[in-house]
């Protein structure tokens, strides 16, 4: 459209053009990089296919047959090399041509190890049955392996169809993920536009020590760096979608991913039970999402190990804030799943405890709340000891990130099956299991649990018996915190970058002031609550983000959040 064309005008000051180039009485298949009428460099093709319908060696010679050199082209002295890297103020890019990508070690593998963050591939790639999917797989794999952006452009309508057909594929990938693609077999010219997040690429490379280890073993000739002029992109509007729920599988992947996540949880718990020769587990069932998912994992694990479900001891422990809705859902769920049901009220024990510690129980402060959580954990631990069982933890990744757990209360267990699953994903998983993995009676209860407000229920209900203490009113929406968590842990983004992305992802849901408020809360609590994560129980890693102090996240408990909070203030 007109606005986009106006905004992109400066970007077109750099062009990559395919053309044949004569050098030393031989013909090279080349990509020529230009900017503002100046030829910056010529990149010849390295691997020339000479099989089946291809016979490029009839015309061209390989870059391998020529040393890096300079030639005169259009009155300019221009470097010629397959190892050219083009430096911009923001990034660095390299080029390979068509068949180069199909080689066992593509030229791009060497280019990225020498600094390229984006690879451009100019191609004349003809169509065949199933070939398009194969090409997409190649590009995705090379982009993922190189931790790079990959821009692929192939010839289309207008090419000769004497023996083959060209569909005009345009594909943009980033670290293995497709960002944008053209319409195949279009009779019109197309412009495929997206943005590649080079900060994200750099974060991936810093984290991946295998990438760094390969830099010293880089194949091929040393790269030649070419400086390019600054291009103004400030007026560009972001076109790539920013997924507001990055932990949640989308579209056709939902069923497969949910099944895989559930299977990982089951496999983790099964191994622990077999290793300990334990045939009994104890789970506190509140009628909320987390304990529900933990119970479902236990049920499926026992089925897999051919152990009786009666060996799953589900304990509901009503307290001062328990509502009829969650209480009844807990009982109905345990009954429908066929586990052993125990009900132990914590009220009398807590009242006695308040007297022992001289606490006024009309004061609903942190002591009032945490005493209940620790009483429940004590019950679970002691019942497990009596029966020779394991206490299964229910806390999720979002709660661990925010420290929304009572230290040595629900924070503690003998194996935490939900430890790397964020709250937004817990909700989707329970809903998926309700629709795919249980009978109708359990399904009705599960769907009501999904619709129940998230709450620890440590404060008495309101006059109508409804939940008064709603977690998201206190610490903020979990969908925001999970978004912050993903961008912070997965890519190491600063608050400013996270705020920018969140403002786009949630522009129809939250205004910028709300996002800033809860981002500040996230940064403050994440640093403050590390001491709880430093002593977490074992639990299986499920996705790409984990807070295990033994694995993915080793952070001092007294790390300062000052820099992050200062940046939040300046947003």
Give the positions of each predicted feature.
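ATP/NTP-dependent adenylation/nucleotidyl-transfer catalytic domains that generate, transfer
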Residues: 89, 146-148, 157-160, 174, ...
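Fold-independent oxyanion-binding glycine-rich loops
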Residues: 18-21, 31, 36, 43-45, ...
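Generic structural signal for hydrophobic
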Residues: 3, 111, 142-143, 273, ...
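Conserved acidic residues
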Residues: 36, 117-118, 279, 389
